[in-house]
Amino acid sequence: MVDGDAEEVARSAEESTEPVKIVQRLGHRGLTIATAESLTAGALAARIADVPGASIALLGGVVAYSNGVKENVLGVDAELLETHGAVDGGVAAQMAQGAALVCRAGLGVSTTGVAGPEPHQGKSVGTVYLGFYVAAGVVQRLGIRMPENCSQDETASVEGALAGYRLLDLDGDREAIRWASVEAALQLVSDVLHTEPTGLPHA
């Protein structure tokens, strides 16, 4: 879990992870990425798309604010949504998987959480789950493993794929929580890529 002041979390992630570096690293490995966003409502995809030439890696994204879109577009399990609500690690992982499958990308990353100002479905303001999914072929080709400070999700329906999530517990206002969620999601993508056994060049 990553916890603390939302603005501090955002700045720390922003300083250590530049979107241009992520796009370059994805491109150098022939990898593509797709996003699924709830509380960030497209801001994560926009952050990646700000990089000139981002189309080499970014295939698309889904803004899944409602449970209906999570279920019907991204394929999130209806029973999971009913039992645990939208703000859940398993939901985040399935959202990431759904984005990757819908967009036919090698990697998927997602955001779901409570930006405020009020709690939601029993989850406190600042509770955020970031999900990720790595296709089986990418796992096999690059040896991608579970990054630190993440939990594996066993509901990935594709054999050999890797799916998981990272929990954030943030203090701050709505804007700061959404900002931190975007930057922390980029950090998560970087962390996933850095599990490649040979490491990544600083390109």
Language-model features, listed with the residues they occupy:
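Short alpha-helical segments enriched in small residues
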Residues: 1-203
